[in-house]
């Protein structure tokens, strides 16, 4: 049977480790997929590469992309704009490839509205103390920003009910293993393969 590409949306509070988990999936080739690189107006963090981690653009360039309907979703978070280029996502899914989006909660909500067939995974910290430790360990945000992110995380965790799966990022290895299990299960989900079998039984 022809296997359709999955749109896998990985989301969760800032500092929960979405980027780290995504990088581990990429590095260890846990399952074959195409990663959709997001666009942002924020400045690169140490070690981040333009075109690999994000497309780093100016606010003017970002607004032009919005005007040209080139983004699947976009929003502003802590003074910076973030968005997902639409064209590459559509092309990869049409080619039957699995696509991974790593986006924030607001972005995931918009994608859910436009592509409800996606698989939505909420990555959550073991607790808020761990989340604070991770944000402090970054060394890139002030105490005021960290407090703001924690307050936002309290609200975002409550929208977990809108997702298909919840994965606790206690360790990166555990989180990656859970995500792989989700992908494997989704590929054999009846709702994803039933149309192929309906076609099969109608054939002569």
Curated annotation (Swiss-Prot):
Q: Where is the Guanylate kinase-like domain?
A: 5-184
Q: What is its EC number?
A: 2.7.4.8
Q: Which GO MF terms does the UniProt record name?
A: ATP binding; guanylate kinase activity
Where it sits in the cell: the answer is:
Cytoplasm
Give the superkingdom in one word: Bacteria
InterPro entries per UniProt? GK/Ca_channel_bsu (IPR008145), Guanylate_kin-like_dom (IPR008144), Guanylate_kinase (IPR017665), Guanylate_kinase_CS (IPR020590), P-loop_NTPase (IPR027417)
- The entry marks the following residues as binding ATP, namely 12-19
Per the record, what are the reactions this protein catalyses?
Answer: GMP + ATP = GDP + ADP
Query: Where does this protein chiefly localize?
Result: cytoplasm
Q: Which Pfam families does this one have?
A: Guanylate_kin (PF00625)
| Signal sequence extent | none
Gene3D superfamilies cross-referenced by the UniProt entry: Guanylate Kinase phosphate binding domain, P-loop containing nucleotide triphosphate hydrolases
Q: Which family does it belong to?
A: Belongs to the guanylate kinase family.
Functionally, this protein is described as follows:
Essential for recycling GMP and indirectly, cGMP.
Q: What is this protein called?
A: Guanylate kinase
Q: Which gene encodes it?
A: gmk
């Amino acid at each position: 049977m022809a296997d359709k590409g999955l749109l896998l949306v990985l989301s969760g509070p800032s500092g929960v480790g979405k980027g780290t988990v995504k990088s581990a999936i990429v590095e260890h080739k846990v399952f074959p997929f195409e990663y959709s690189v997001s666009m942002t107006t924020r400045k690169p963090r140490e070690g981040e590469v333009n075109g690999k981690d994000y497309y780093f653009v100016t606010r003017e360039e970002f607004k032009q992309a919005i005007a040209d309907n080139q983004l699947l979703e976009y929003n502003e978070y802590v003074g910076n704009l973030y968005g997902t280029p639409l064209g590459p996502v559509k092309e990869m899914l049409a080619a039957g490839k699995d696509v991974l989006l790593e986006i924030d909660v607001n972005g995931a909500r918009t994608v859910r509205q436009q592509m409800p067939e996606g698989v939505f995974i909420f990555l959550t910290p073991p607790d808020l103390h761990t989340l604070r430790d991770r944000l402090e360990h970054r060394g890139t945000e002030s105490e005021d920003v960290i407090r703001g992110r924690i307050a936002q995380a309290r609200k975002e965790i409550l929208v977990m009910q809108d997702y298909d799966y919840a994965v606790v990022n206690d360790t990166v290895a555990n989180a990656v293993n859970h995500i792989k299990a989700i992908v494997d299960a989704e590929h054999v989900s009846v709702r994803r393969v039933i149309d192929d079998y309906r076609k099969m039984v109608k054939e002569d």
